[in-house]
C-alpha cells in the first residue's frame, strides 16, 4: 500500500484530501419520449424512482433492475457547497464513467457534456454555484448504435453469443473536489531505468502573470518512508518538465543501494508528493506513486526490466452478477486480483472494458500485469472512427502512469474493422491508432488487433479454441511458418496477418484459448464440447495449457476466462466468484515450467 492511498478514492494516482463521494441515492426518471429537455427537466423533474449510483438501472444493485432498453434517462441530487471555500478554490465534479452522452446542469444552468462511455471526464461548475444547497441534474443518452464503442454490451433486445445486457448511464463513481485556483492539473510520470530517474511532465493551471520564478512545482520522492530526492521546478508555462532521482543511497535505513524495480514477484512502489508553491506559499498538494519498470521487445522476446517475461494471463471481463460492469465494492476488485493470483496467473487481459482505476491501483500494489483494452464498435464508418479515436486517446492518457499496464490493445478480433484483412481503409485506421498510441506512449508494446489479421503490431497474438492439447501444440510446431505467412489459417477461417503485412520476428503469444464450458446450466455456452465433471475439466485444462506451453517459440498465453458472465459459462469461477475446481490444481498446471518458459530458468 502506498502513502497516498485513500479507500474508495477514485483517481488513485492523483490524490487530494478535499473531496466528496457523490455515490448513493439519486432521484431518477426514464424519458422514453425524449421530451425532458424540451420540458426543461433540468430545472426539476418529477422523479418517481430513485437509483443507487453508480449502478445502472439494469442491475439489481441499482434498486431498479429493469433490463429493457431506455435510451434517455435523468438523474438528480442535491450538493452542499461552502461559498467561503470557493474564494480560493474551484469546485470540480468528476464522472469516472457514464455511457454514452452525458449532459450536466447545475441549478438549471447548463454545465457541459461529454461523449463516450469509458473514460473519466470532469466539469468545473464553480460559476454556477451558490452557498449552501445546489441542484445537480444529469441526463444520459445511449442507444444500440453499433458505431459507438460498446464492448460486450448487446445491440439487440436480448443477449446473444458473448454479448450481454447493455450498460446505460452512470456506471462508475461520481465525486467532487475543491481544487485551488492555482493548481497541478496533471502529471505524466515515465521511469528511466538507464538514468535511474523519473521523467516528469507537469500541466499547471495558473494565470500567465504568475508564470516564472514566483511559481514552482516540487516533487518529493520516498521509498517505504525513506526520503530519496526532491526536485523543484520553475513554472514558466502551462507545461513544464523535470527529472527526479530515484537511486536509494540510504543503507543506514536497512535498504539496499540502487533502484527498486517493479515486477510481479516484487512490485516495489515509490511514493511521490507534489506541491505547487506560489510566492513562497504552498497552494496545492497532490499525493501519488510510481514504479521503476521497463517493458520492451527484443526480437522474439518480451523483456521486463531486461529479463525475458513469460506471461501467464487470464481473460477478465469485469462483470458481476448483481452489478454487471460496475464493481460492487473495492473489496470485490481486490478479491478478483487475489483469486487470479491463487490460480497461478501473473497477469490479465482486461477485456473490452476500461476498469475502475482502483483496480489498476491494486494491480500496481499486488504485482498483477495488465493488458489494457477498450470497448469495440461493431461497424466501420467515419463516425465510428471519430468516436473510437477520441475515447482511446483519453484512456491512454488517463491510465499512462500505472506500472501494471504493460500493453495497449485497441482492437480485438477485427471487431469494428471486420474487413481489415483486405480493405486498406480499415488497415490504415489500425495503423493510425498504433502510431497515435505511440505518440503518447513510446515505451509500451501495442497490439493493434488481438487474435488475428494483424497490421502493424509489436506482438503477434493468436486466438485458438482447439480443445485437444496435442492438436493445438502440433499445429503451431508443425505449421509455424505457414501460419505466420498466412498460408494456413490458425483459427478456422482467420489468418495471422492482414493482406499486405508480413511477420517480422515479433514475440508470439496465444492470447485466447480454452473457454471450457462447465456448470450445471444446460442453456449456457463456452467453446468446444461442454464438460460435466471436475475431473473432465481438469484433464482438458491440463492438456490444452500444457500444449500451449510446449510450443517452443510462444512466450505467453491467456486463458478464457476468470468467471462466468451471464450466459457464458466458461469461467474458472462462477459469477459469485466461487472456484469451480481446486485453485491449487489449476495453479500447479499454470506454473509448471515447460517449453519457452523453461528455457530461461
Residue ranges of model-derived segments:
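Short glycine/proline/serine/threonine-rich loop/turn segments at secondary-structure transition edges
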Residues: 85-89, 129-133, 146-147, 211-212, ...
Amino acid at each position: 500500500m502506498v502513502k497516498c492511498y485513500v479507500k474508495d478514492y477514485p483517481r488513485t494516482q492523483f490524490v487530494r484530501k478535499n473531496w466528496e463521494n457523490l455515490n448513493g441515492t439519486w432521484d431518477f426518471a426514464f424519458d422514453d419520449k425524449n421530451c425532458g429537455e424540451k420540458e426543461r427537466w433540468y430545472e426539476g423533474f418529477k422523479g418517481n424512482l430513485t437509483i443507487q449510483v453508480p449502478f445502472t438501472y439494469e442491475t439489481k444493485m441499482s434498486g431498479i433492475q429493469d433490463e429493457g432498453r431506455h435510451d434517455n434517462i435523468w438523474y438528480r441530487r442535491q450538493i452542499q457547497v461552502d461559498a467561503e471555500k470557493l474564494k480560493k478554490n474551484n469546485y470540480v465534479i468528476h464522472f469516472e464513467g457514464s455511457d454514452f452522452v452525458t449532459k450536466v446542469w447545475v441549478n438549471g444552468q447548463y454545465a457541459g457534456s461529454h461523449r463516450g462511455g469509458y473514460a473519466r471526464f470532469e466539469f468545473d461548475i464553480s460559476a454556477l454555484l451558490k452557498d449552501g444547497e445546489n441542484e445537480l441534474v444529469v441526463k444520459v443518452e445511449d442507444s444500440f448504435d453499433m458505431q459507438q464503442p460498446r464492448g460486450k454490451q448487446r445491440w439487440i433486445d436480448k443477449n446473444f453469443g458473448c454479448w450481454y445486457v447493455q450498460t446505460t448511464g452512470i456506471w462508475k463513481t461520481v465525486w467532487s473536489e475543491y481544487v485551488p485556483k492555482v493548481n497541478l492539473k496533471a502529471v505524466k510520470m515515465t521511469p528511466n531505468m538507464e538514468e535511474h530517474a523519473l521523467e516528469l511532465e507537469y500541466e499547471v493551471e495558473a494565470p500567465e502573470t504568475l508564470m516564472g520564478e514566483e511559481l514552482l512545482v516540487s516533487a518529493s520522492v520516498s521509498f517505504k518512508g525513506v526520503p530519496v530526492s526532491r526536485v523543484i521546478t520553475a513554472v514558466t508555462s502551462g507545461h513544464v518538465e523535470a527529472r527526479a532521482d530515484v537511486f536509494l543511497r540510504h543503507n543506514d535505513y536497512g535498504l539496499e543501494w540502487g533502484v527498486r524495480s517493479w515486477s510481479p514477484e516484487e512490485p516495489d512502489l515509490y511514493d511521490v508528493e507534489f506541491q505547487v508553491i506560489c510566492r513562497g506559499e504552498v497552494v496545492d498538494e497532490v499525493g501519488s506513486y510510481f514504479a521503476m519498470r521497463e517493458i520492451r521487445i527484443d526480437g522474439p522476446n518480451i523483456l521486463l526490466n531486461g529479463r525475458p517475461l513469460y506471461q501467464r494471463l487470464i481473460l477478465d471481463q469485469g462483470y458481476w452478477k448483481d452489478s454487471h460492469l460496475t464493481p460492487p465494492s473495492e473489496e470485490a476488485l481486490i478479491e478478483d486480483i487475489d483469486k487470479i493470483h491463487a490460480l497461478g496467473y501473473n497477469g490479465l487481459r482486461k477485456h473490452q472494458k476500461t476498469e475502475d482505476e482502483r483496480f489498476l491501483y491494486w494491480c500496481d500494489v499486488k504485482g498483477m500485469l495488465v493488458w489494457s483494452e477498450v470497448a469495440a464498435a461493431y461497424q466501420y464508418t467515419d463516425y465510428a472512427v471519430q468516436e473510437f479515436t477520441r475515447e482511446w486517446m483519453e484512456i491512454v492518457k488517463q491510465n499512462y502512469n500505472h506500472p501494471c499496464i504493460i500493453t495497449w490493445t485497441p482492437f480485438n478480433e477485427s471487431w469494428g474493422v471486420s474487413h481489415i484483412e483486405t480493405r486498406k481503409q480499415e488497415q490504415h485506421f489500425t495503423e493510425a491508432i498504433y502510431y497515435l498510441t505511440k505518440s503518447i506512449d513510446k515505451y509500451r508494446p501495442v497490439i493493434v488487433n488481438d487474435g488475428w489479421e494483424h497490421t502493424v503490431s509489436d506482438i503477434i497474438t493468436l486466438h485458438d479454441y482447439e480443445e485437444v492439447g496435442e492438436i493445438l501444440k502440433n499445429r503451431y510446431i508443425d505449421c509455424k511458418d505457414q501460419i505466420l505467412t498466412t498460408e494456413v489459417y490458425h483459427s478456422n477461417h482467420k489468418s495471422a496477418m492482414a493482406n499486405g503485412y508480413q511477420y517480422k520476428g515479433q514475440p508470439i503469444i496465444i492470447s485466447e484459448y480454452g473457454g471450457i464450458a462447465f456448470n450445471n446450466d444446460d442453456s449456457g455456452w463456452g467453446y468446444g464440447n461442454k464438460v460435466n465433471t471436475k475431473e473432465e475439466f481438469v484433464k482438458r485444462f491440463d492438456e490444452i495449457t500444457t500444449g500451449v506451453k510446449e510450443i517452443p517459440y510462444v512466450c505467453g498465453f491467456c486463458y478464457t476466462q476468470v468467471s462466468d458472465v451471464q450466459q457464458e459459462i466458461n469461467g474458472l469461477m462462477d459469477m459469485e466468484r466461487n472456484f469451480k475446481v481446486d485453485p491449487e490444481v489449476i495453479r500447479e498446471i499454470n506454473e509448471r515450467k515447460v517449453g519457452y518458459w523453461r528455457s530461461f530458468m
